Amino acid sequence: MEPRAGCRLPVRVEQVVNGALVVTVSCGERSFAGILLDCTKKSGLFGLPPLAPLPQVDESPVNDSHGRAPEEGDAEVMQLGSSSPPPARGVQPPETTRPEPPPPLVPPLPAGSLPPYPPYFEGAPFPHPLWLRDTYKLWVPQPPPRTIKRTRRRLSRNRDPGRLILSTIRLRPRQVLCEKCKSTLSPPEASPGPPAAPRARRRLGSGPDRELRKPEEPENGEPTAAATARRSKRERREEDRAPAEQVPRSPVIKISYSTPQGKGEVVKIPSRVHGSLEPFRPQQAPQDDGSQDPEVLDRESRDRPSCAPSASIPKLKLTRPVPAGADLPPPKIRLKPHRLGDSEHEPVYRAELVGELNGYLRDSSPAPCADGPAGGLADLSSGSSGEDDDFKSCPQGPQGREGLAFLVSCPEGRADCASESACSSDSLDEARSSGSEGTPADTGDLSPGHGASAPSVSREARQTVPPLTVRLHTQSVSECITEDGRTVAVGDIVWGKIHGFPWWPARVLDISLGQKEDGEPSWREAKVSWFGSPTTSFLSISKLSPFSEFFKLRFNRKKKGMYRKAITEAANAARHVAPEIRELLTQFET
């Protein structure tokens, strides 16, 4: 008898493994084997649509067709679509152990008809195990693919990767001094309002000048006679000496050192108000009019008002005392350049008086070292880079008592001021770095020994400086020969150096030769435009080197970004890219 859908067949359970039954059934001359799964468990395939309830029909001919009745071991009859087999401890007929089928999830299919492939839609149960068994290597419905959450890699500054544009770099000299150092070195500007009094603080161990606590007074404000009697003479003397408003001061410092001649020197640094910018005045030798008592000098230093705003204490400069017969130093003058036209080649500088560090000109006194030309240069250049040490060694020409000496401080802590000629090229190359709009530099440099002298000015009229004009003759040339014999022409691609940046490629825009009216040695400088930057600068000819010849020496392999882009632009502008340059550019690209 051929099996058909809905018929019942006795099966033989061969093995039971983890809720699955391995069964065999013989139908005529053919034998079938398979695995029956427990559909009541939630592991594996579950939620299968149950079959329609079959009619209770005696299938005695089916059993007779095998020629034998089922044995006792084969008494358990398995039904397709039924639940788990009955428990082993109770042997009951299959009809009584068959549970009620759950309500069908999908409409039941008529007996004997199967779809070509199981329908699948959202929320539908998994197909029947026999359907999966009959569809090996065929189309099998799969659940929808689950969404895989991918974490997006965070870019720098949350930028779109397609819009990563290299920002332009502005080649400007870096600031060497901080705000405190600049306020210490530059003269304070006069503020419209009254100067703010320094905050009175009590500091431990402030030396012999620390405040003494006054004895308590009664509520009516009148001190008692006993408290007055207990006061010592020293307390009353210090209370009378102290000003109305107590200001914390620094302790008195004494420093002893030996001179090359073997003599011992002692420098006494008097007490000063915290935050004052008054420079250190070393104790001078006794004068003809008689020496003053150190206590009197100490009292005068206390009573001197502090007219400078509160700031940090400047660095102490220990200089040797100046001989008594030294002349007074000339006043300091700053030169302000005026904007030049397109056709002008002679820059005109206006001279104006530069105030002292504390904002006013002090009265005449034995010439202190801090006010001399060398001391002034040292004060203006202190705190900057190591190259400023050359600035202190400028030769000082002999100056008269009423002579005017030009002095220009390096702006923003610029170095390269070591030159004997007026407006030296080394001091103008980095200080005159400007933007593409061609803004002129703030100051020029004139060393004291070579400046033009003005008419004699009385000491009372030092506050006003007569108009003074210094004309510097400049000439534009197309090419120039350096000291080592190389020729630099307009349009050349060269390497240039600015403080705070690596060697950077640039194009020469103009070459200027300068000379003073009195025939002093000229200087040679070039105006260059930087590749990859909108800025232009004035550099000394001696600081320029050819781009191709010095490529291996100047190229920095560690720099990326705009530096690499500027190198590529300079190589293309040179109209030929040497093989070694191309190899270096492509070797380190990422």
Curated annotation (Swiss-Prot):
GO terms for biological process: chromatin remodeling; positive regulation of transcription elongation by RNA polymerase II; regulation of cold-induced thermogenesis. Residues 490-550 form the PWWP domain. Residues 376-385 have a biased composition (Low complexity). Residues 99-110 have a biased composition (Pro residues). Deubiquitinated by BRCC3; leading to its stabilization. One of its GO terms (cellular component) is nucleus. Transmembrane segments: none annotated. CDD domains: PWWP_PWWP2B. The modification Phosphoserine is found at residues 84, 186, 206, 250, 447. Keywords: Phosphoprotein, Transcription, Transcription regulation. GO terms for molecular function: NuRD complex binding. InterPro entries: PWWP_dom (IPR000313). It holds the Pfam family PWWP. Residues 208-217, 296-305 have a biased composition (Basic and acidic residues). The keyword S-adenosyl-L-methionine does not apply. It comes from the Eukaryota. Residues 52-110, 182-347, 360-398, 426-467 are annotated as: Disordered. Component of a MTA1-specific subcomplex of the NuRD complex composed of PWWP2B, MTA1 and HDAC1 but does not contain CHD4 and MBD3. Interacts with MTA1 and HDAC1. Interacts with MTA2, MTA3, HDAC2, RBBP4, RBBP7, BRCC3 and ZNF516. Does not interact with CHD4 and MBD3. Chromatin-binding protein that acts as an adapter between distinct nucleosome components (H3K36me3 or H2A.Z) and chromatin-modifying complexes, contributing to the regulation of the levels of histone acetylation at actively transcribed genes. Competes with CHD4 and MBD3 for interaction with MTA1 to form a NuRD subcomplex, preventing the formation of full NuRD complex (containing CHD4 and MBD3), leading to recruitment of HDACs to gene promoters resulting in turn in the deacetylation of nearby H3K27 and H2A.Z. This is PWWP domain-containing protein 2B. The gene is PWWP2B.
